[in-house]
Curated annotation (Swiss-Prot):
CDD domains: RuvC (cd16962). Signal peptide: none annotated. GO terms for cellular component: cytoplasm; Holliday junction resolvase complex. It is found in: Cytoplasm. The gene is ruvC. Binds 2 Mg(2+) ion per subunit. HAMAP family: RuvC (MF_00034). One of its GO terms (molecular function) is crossover junction DNA endonuclease activity. This is Crossover junction endodeoxyribonuclease RuvC. It catalyses: Endonucleolytic cleavage at a junction such as a reciprocal single-stranded crossover between two homologous DNA duplexes (Holliday junction). Its EC number is 3.1.21.10. Belongs to the RuvC family. Homodimer which binds Holliday junction (HJ) DNA. The HJ becomes 2-fold symmetrical on binding to RuvC with unstacked arms; it has a different conformation from HJ DNA in complex with RuvA. In the full resolvosome a probable DNA-RuvA(4)-RuvB(12)-RuvC(2) complex forms which resolves the HJ. The active site is at residues 8, 67, 139.
Length: 159
């Protein structure tokens, strides 16, 4: 029963979602957000690294999946997002986890069936696919969607 950790990186809020799969059934294990205060970028990156490390220790995932950086019109935002991704990936690498990256359009296409889906559609489908009593917040839903994408695509390519 492989455990998959999905990460939706951000310099202010990093979402995480943990799922497993048993007999082609998705199983929700946990989700949430790592929130960083406005104490400067180095401190934020430290909190993201520590938070991801703690989540890895708690859930012991077999796979680490993260959203790829998209090109942004705001270079500063793209750089901060890249740095947040980097420290999350280092946390996974320090635990010898295999790292998989998925584009946002690919995640939306896999989970919703539409690569241009909005956040509400992603939340709805994540809730439906994981049989959750309520929709997770958008950052956690995006992270769970990344994990679901890995579950579908990795299983497809493994056979």
């Amino acid at each position: 029963m492989p455990i998959i950790l999905g990460i939706d990186p951000g310099s202010r809020i990093t979402g995480y979602g943990v799922i497993s799969e048993k007999k082609n059934q998705l199983i929700y294990l946990g989700s949430g957000c790592i929130r960083t205060l406005d104490n400067g970028l180095p401190h934020k990156l430290k909190l993201i690294y520590a938070g991801v490390t703690e989540i890895i220790s708690q859930f012991r995932p077999d796979f680490f999946c993260i959203e790829q950086v998209f090109m942004s019109k705001n270079a500063d935002s793209a750089l901060k997002l890249g740095q947040a991704r980097g420290v999350a990936i280092v946390a996974a690498a320090n635990q010898n986890l295999p790292v998989f990256e998925y584009a946002a359009r690919q995640v939306k296409q896999t989970v919703v069936g539409n690569g241009a889906a909005d956040k509400k559609q992603v939340q709805h489908m994540v809730r439906y696919l994981l049989k959750l009593p309520s929709a997770p917040n958008t950052d956690a839903a995006d992270a769970l969607a990344i994990a679901i994408t890995h579950s579908h695509l990795y299983a497809f390519h493994a056979h």
